[in-house]
């Protein structure tokens, strides 16, 4: 991050966890949105179950090298070394985060992007905790970011972790409004490839709400921050049956039914945080959530293999 507000943790590159007294109190808008989420899930459940049961795995036809991407960040002072490491790895698909609050200070980002010539870039435009308080400002910030970076890419992933209050959205309805304000920019920028939904972890109710609604936007692909580290390996289950493969299967089944997204699933974030790396990993030292380097490498390899063999992930 170029600029780091007081609510931003520069080590873990995310907003600080909200204290109880800082969490927004429930309002009628929250209750109404929760009701919409529940009703949408209830009405969609039969079709989702059918879609899930009919879905069959089919290994991806992509070159495995094209299937793998890497997320990079700016602001640590070793951008040239990072470019060298990216080239050494041979990875071609890169994701660069640009926070909305850096919209007036983009020179360092464009300089960095210039050094990544020839790479396929996706830019993740991060919302701030204040974005849902001023949607016009949010739109203006996104407009500036796209305008300055459109010479490097037309792929933009909008928002991050919409189901975490510390990122600014008190409920999914606010996230949909952020997406709508970006949709209005299509008349100014042609051939945009927009990713959205942006639900972190496995929360199918909110994923379905973000994919099936009457908001005014369209997505070229669904972005899922599908972390499974709390279940240990990718074969660990949640709710008894949902290991990584079944989580991908359910997410893909919902995308196939979506009236907001094309039938494309991108896993835009996943990882296993490392042991003994505080303050960069806030919960480091907890063996139920963090792993050593050898285990991380093994789990990431399994994750990629499962996702690739399913054929459900782009």
Model regions: which residues?
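Catalytic domains of carbohydrate-active enzymes, especially glycoside hydrolases
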Residues: 63-104, 115-116, 120-122, 148-154
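Short, acidic/polar
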Residues: 72-88, 108-109, 134-148, 203-214, ...
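Alpha-helical membrane-targeting segments
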Residues: 22-63
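Substrate-binding cleft of extracellular glycoside hydrolase catalytic domains
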Residues: 116-177, 289
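Substrate-binding cleft of secreted/luminal carbohydrate-active enzymes
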Residues: 2-27, 44, 153-156, 264, ...
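Hydrophobic faces of well-ordered beta-strands that scaffold small-molecule active sites
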Residues: 66-72, 92-96, 121-125, 154-158, ...
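Acidic-and-aromatic substrate-binding clefts and catalytic sites of carbohydrate-active enzymes
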Residues: 71-81, 95-108, 127-139, 164-168, ...
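Noncatalytic carbohydrate-binding groove/subsite architecture in carbohydrate-active enzymes
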Residues: 172-312
